[in-house]
Amino acid sequence: MALLRGVWGVLNALGKSGADLCAGCGSRLRYPFSFAYVPKWFSSSLSGYPKKPMTSYVRFSKEQLPIFKAQNPDAKNSELIKKIAKLWRELPDSEKKIYEDAYRADWQVYKEEINRIQEQLTPSQMVSLEKEIMQKRLKKKALIKKRELTMLGKPKRPRSAYNIFIAERFQEARDGTSQVKLKAINENWKNLSNSQKQVYIQLAKDDKIRYYNEMKSWEEQMMEVGREDLIRRSIKYPAKNDPEKF
Protein backbone atom coordinates (compact mmCIF):
# COMPACT_ATOMS: atom_id res chain seq x y z
CA MET A 1 0.00 0.00 0.00
CA ALA A 2 2.87 2.37 0.81
CA LEU A 3 4.38 1.64 -2.58
CA LEU A 4 1.05 2.32 -4.25
CA ARG A 5 0.72 5.66 -2.49
CA GLY A 6 4.29 6.56 -3.39
CA VAL A 7 3.89 5.86 -7.08
CA TRP A 8 0.52 7.57 -7.12
CA GLY A 9 2.23 10.66 -5.75
CA VAL A 10 4.82 10.51 -8.49
CA LEU A 11 2.22 10.01 -11.22
CA ASN A 12 0.08 12.76 -9.80
CA ALA A 13 3.02 15.17 -9.61
CA LEU A 14 4.57 14.35 -12.94
CA GLY A 15 1.67 13.49 -15.18
CA LYS A 16 1.02 17.10 -16.13
CA SER A 17 0.05 18.27 -19.56
CA GLY A 18 1.11 21.53 -21.16
CA ALA A 19 -2.38 22.86 -20.57
CA ASP A 20 -2.09 22.22 -16.83
CA LEU A 21 1.23 24.05 -16.72
CA CYS A 22 -0.39 27.08 -18.30
CA ALA A 23 -3.26 27.09 -15.83
CA GLY A 24 -4.21 30.67 -15.12
CA CYS A 25 -2.12 32.10 -17.95
CA GLY A 26 -4.69 32.02 -20.74
CA SER A 27 -2.74 29.77 -23.09
CA ARG A 28 -1.57 26.21 -23.50
CA LEU A 29 1.13 24.36 -25.34
CA ARG A 30 0.43 23.57 -28.97
CA TYR A 31 0.98 19.86 -28.39
CA PRO A 32 0.02 18.02 -25.19
CA PHE A 33 2.88 16.66 -23.14
CA SER A 34 3.21 14.57 -20.03
CA PHE A 35 6.15 14.51 -17.64
CA ALA A 36 5.56 10.81 -17.17
CA TYR A 37 7.64 8.55 -19.37
CA VAL A 38 5.53 5.55 -20.37
CA PRO A 39 7.47 2.35 -21.18
CA LYS A 40 6.41 0.30 -24.22
CA TRP A 41 4.98 -2.51 -22.13
CA PHE A 42 2.87 0.06 -20.31
CA SER A 43 1.59 1.81 -23.42
CA SER A 44 0.81 -1.35 -25.36
CA SER A 45 -1.17 -2.99 -22.58
CA LEU A 46 -2.99 0.07 -21.28
CA SER A 47 -3.14 2.27 -24.40
CA GLY A 48 -1.26 5.21 -22.94
CA TYR A 49 -1.36 7.37 -19.86
CA PRO A 50 -4.13 9.97 -19.38
CA LYS A 51 -3.42 13.69 -19.41
CA LYS A 52 -4.74 15.98 -16.73
CA PRO A 53 -7.87 17.85 -17.82
CA MET A 54 -7.79 21.53 -18.71
CA THR A 55 -8.75 23.95 -15.97
CA SER A 56 -11.78 26.15 -16.47
CA TYR A 57 -9.63 29.15 -17.39
CA VAL A 58 -7.45 27.23 -19.83
CA ARG A 59 -10.55 25.73 -21.48
CA PHE A 60 -11.98 29.23 -21.91
CA SER A 61 -8.67 30.53 -23.26
CA LYS A 62 -8.40 27.71 -25.77
CA GLU A 63 -11.81 28.60 -27.14
CA GLN A 64 -11.10 32.32 -27.28
CA LEU A 65 -7.55 32.29 -28.66
CA PRO A 66 -8.49 31.42 -32.29
CA ILE A 67 -11.16 34.12 -32.22
CA PHE A 68 -8.76 36.75 -30.93
CA LYS A 69 -6.09 35.69 -33.42
CA ALA A 70 -8.53 36.06 -36.29
CA GLN A 71 -9.50 39.52 -35.08
CA ASN A 72 -5.88 40.54 -34.36
CA PRO A 73 -3.67 38.60 -36.83
CA ASP A 74 -0.58 40.74 -36.17
CA ALA A 75 -0.83 40.72 -32.38
CA LYS A 76 1.63 38.80 -30.21
CA ASN A 77 0.46 35.90 -28.06
CA SER A 78 1.28 37.88 -24.93
CA GLU A 79 -1.05 40.68 -26.07
CA LEU A 80 -3.84 38.23 -26.82
CA ILE A 81 -3.36 36.57 -23.44
CA LYS A 82 -3.84 39.92 -21.76
CA LYS A 83 -7.10 40.53 -23.62
CA ILE A 84 -8.41 37.05 -22.88
CA ALA A 85 -7.54 37.42 -19.20
CA LYS A 86 -9.49 40.68 -19.07
CA LEU A 87 -12.47 39.03 -20.76
CA TRP A 88 -12.35 36.15 -18.26
CA ARG A 89 -12.30 38.53 -15.29
CA GLU A 90 -15.38 40.30 -16.65
CA LEU A 91 -17.24 37.06 -17.39
CA PRO A 92 -20.38 36.60 -15.22
CA ASP A 93 -20.17 33.87 -12.58
CA SER A 94 -23.01 32.02 -14.28
CA GLU A 95 -20.94 31.68 -17.46
CA LYS A 96 -17.76 30.79 -15.57
CA LYS A 97 -19.67 28.00 -13.88
CA ILE A 98 -20.11 26.26 -17.24
CA TYR A 99 -16.34 25.92 -17.59
CA GLU A 100 -15.88 25.01 -13.93
CA ASP A 101 -18.47 22.24 -14.15
CA ALA A 102 -16.79 20.87 -17.28
CA TYR A 103 -13.44 20.80 -15.48
CA ARG A 104 -14.88 18.95 -12.48
CA ALA A 105 -16.50 16.36 -14.74
CA ASP A 106 -13.25 15.80 -16.65
CA TRP A 107 -11.31 15.57 -13.40
CA GLN A 108 -13.58 12.80 -12.14
CA VAL A 109 -13.03 10.83 -15.36
CA TYR A 110 -9.27 11.41 -15.04
CA LYS A 111 -9.17 10.04 -11.48
CA GLU A 112 -11.16 6.97 -12.45
CA GLU A 113 -8.76 6.29 -15.33
CA ILE A 114 -5.75 6.60 -13.01
CA ASN A 115 -7.31 4.09 -10.63
CA ARG A 116 -7.98 1.70 -13.50
CA ILE A 117 -4.36 1.88 -14.61
CA GLN A 118 -2.99 1.32 -11.12
CA GLU A 119 -5.12 -1.76 -10.63
CA GLN A 120 -3.54 -3.38 -13.71
CA LEU A 121 0.08 -2.76 -12.72
CA THR A 122 2.11 -5.31 -10.83
CA PRO A 123 4.38 -4.06 -8.01
CA SER A 124 7.47 -4.63 -10.18
CA GLN A 125 5.93 -2.70 -13.06
CA MET A 126 5.10 0.18 -10.75
CA VAL A 127 8.68 0.29 -9.46
CA SER A 128 10.00 0.30 -13.04
CA LEU A 129 7.61 3.06 -14.00
CA GLU A 130 8.61 5.15 -11.01
CA LYS A 131 12.30 4.85 -11.90
CA GLU A 132 11.69 5.82 -15.53
CA ILE A 133 9.62 8.80 -14.48
CA MET A 134 12.30 10.12 -12.16
CA GLN A 135 15.00 9.68 -14.82
CA LYS A 136 13.06 11.68 -17.39
CA ARG A 137 11.48 14.25 -15.10
CA LEU A 138 14.05 17.08 -15.16
CA LYS A 139 14.67 16.89 -18.89
CA LYS A 140 10.97 16.86 -19.71
CA LYS A 141 10.25 19.63 -17.23
CA ALA A 142 12.91 21.89 -18.74
CA LEU A 143 11.64 21.26 -22.27
CA ILE A 144 8.04 21.94 -21.35
CA LYS A 145 9.02 25.08 -19.48
CA LYS A 146 10.93 26.38 -22.48
CA ARG A 147 8.02 25.73 -24.84
CA GLU A 148 5.57 27.23 -22.38
CA LEU A 149 7.58 30.46 -22.16
CA THR A 150 7.81 30.60 -25.95
CA MET A 151 4.06 30.12 -26.23
CA LEU A 152 3.52 32.88 -23.68
CA GLY A 153 5.56 35.24 -25.81
CA LYS A 154 8.53 35.71 -23.48
CA PRO A 155 11.01 38.10 -25.15
CA LYS A 156 14.17 36.66 -26.63
CA ARG A 157 17.34 37.34 -24.68
CA PRO A 158 19.65 40.08 -26.03
CA ARG A 159 22.40 39.08 -28.43
CA SER A 160 26.07 39.93 -28.14
CA ALA A 161 27.90 41.99 -30.76
CA TYR A 162 29.57 38.82 -32.01
CA ASN A 163 26.26 36.96 -32.34
CA ILE A 164 24.71 39.83 -34.28
CA PHE A 165 27.68 39.81 -36.66
CA ILE A 166 27.44 36.03 -37.10
CA ALA A 167 23.71 36.16 -37.86
CA GLU A 168 24.18 38.95 -40.39
CA ARG A 169 27.05 37.36 -42.28
CA PHE A 170 25.71 33.81 -42.13
CA GLN A 171 22.65 34.82 -44.15
CA GLU A 172 24.89 36.39 -46.77
CA ALA A 173 27.23 33.39 -47.04
CA ARG A 174 26.19 30.87 -49.69
CA ASP A 175 29.04 28.46 -50.35
CA GLY A 176 30.22 25.66 -48.08
CA THR A 177 28.81 23.81 -45.12
CA SER A 178 27.65 25.53 -41.95
CA GLN A 179 30.92 24.67 -40.25
CA VAL A 180 32.95 26.18 -43.09
CA LYS A 181 30.80 29.31 -43.09
CA LEU A 182 31.15 29.81 -39.34
CA LYS A 183 34.91 29.38 -39.51
CA ALA A 184 35.20 31.99 -42.27
CA ILE A 185 32.87 34.42 -40.49
CA ASN A 186 34.81 34.01 -37.25
CA GLU A 187 38.01 34.96 -39.07
CA ASN A 188 36.26 37.98 -40.55
CA TRP A 189 35.24 39.07 -37.06
CA LYS A 190 38.80 38.81 -35.80
CA ASN A 191 40.00 40.97 -38.68
CA LEU A 192 37.52 43.77 -38.06
CA SER A 193 38.92 47.05 -36.80
CA ASN A 194 37.75 48.45 -33.47
CA SER A 195 35.66 51.07 -35.26
CA GLN A 196 33.96 48.38 -37.36
CA LYS A 197 33.24 46.29 -34.27
CA GLN A 198 31.81 49.34 -32.55
CA VAL A 199 28.84 49.24 -34.93
CA TYR A 200 27.87 45.79 -33.67
CA ILE A 201 28.65 46.70 -30.08
CA GLN A 202 26.14 49.53 -30.33
CA LEU A 203 23.56 47.21 -31.88
CA ALA A 204 24.05 44.83 -28.95
CA LYS A 205 23.52 47.67 -26.46
CA ASP A 206 20.33 48.63 -28.25
CA ASP A 207 19.21 45.02 -28.09
CA LYS A 208 19.73 44.99 -24.33
CA ILE A 209 17.47 48.01 -24.00
CA ARG A 210 14.90 46.30 -26.23
CA TYR A 211 15.04 43.20 -24.03
CA TYR A 212 14.64 45.18 -20.82
CA ASN A 213 11.61 47.09 -22.12
CA GLU A 214 9.92 43.98 -23.54
CA MET A 215 10.56 41.98 -20.36
CA LYS A 216 9.11 44.75 -18.22
CA SER A 217 5.93 44.77 -20.31
CA TRP A 218 5.76 40.97 -20.45
CA GLU A 219 6.15 40.55 -16.70
CA GLU A 220 3.38 43.08 -16.10
CA GLN A 221 1.14 40.95 -18.31
CA MET A 222 2.12 37.81 -16.43
CA MET A 223 1.21 39.51 -13.15
CA GLU A 224 -2.22 40.35 -14.55
CA VAL A 225 -2.94 36.74 -15.51
CA GLY A 226 -1.72 35.32 -12.19
CA ARG A 227 1.65 33.96 -13.29
CA GLU A 228 3.83 35.55 -10.60
CA ASP A 229 6.00 32.42 -10.72
CA LEU A 230 7.44 33.67 -14.02
CA ILE A 231 8.53 37.04 -12.63
CA ARG A 232 12.24 37.56 -12.03
CA ARG A 233 13.20 38.13 -8.41
CA SER A 234 15.93 40.58 -9.33
CA ILE A 235 15.92 42.83 -12.38
CA LYS A 236 19.14 44.11 -13.90
CA TYR A 237 18.80 47.50 -15.53
CA PRO A 238 20.89 48.08 -18.67
CA ALA A 239 23.81 50.36 -17.91
CA LYS A 240 24.41 53.30 -20.21
CA ASN A 241 28.12 52.62 -20.52
CA ASP A 242 28.04 48.88 -20.06
CA PRO A 243 31.09 47.44 -21.90
CA GLU A 244 30.10 44.83 -24.47
CA LYS A 245 31.81 41.46 -24.17
CA PHE A 246 32.64 39.58 -27.34
UniProtKB/Swiss-Prot annotation:
First-listed, main subcellular location of the protein, grouped into a coarse class: mitochondrion
PROSITE patterns linked: HMG_BOX_2 (PS50118)
Transit peptide, from-to: 1-42
A single GO BP: positive regulation of DNA-templated transcription
CDD domains recorded: HMG-box_TFAM_rpt2
Highest rank taxon of the organism: Eukaryota
Protein name: Transcription factor A, mitochondrial
Organism for this UniProt entry: Bos taurus
Gene this protein is translated from: TFAM
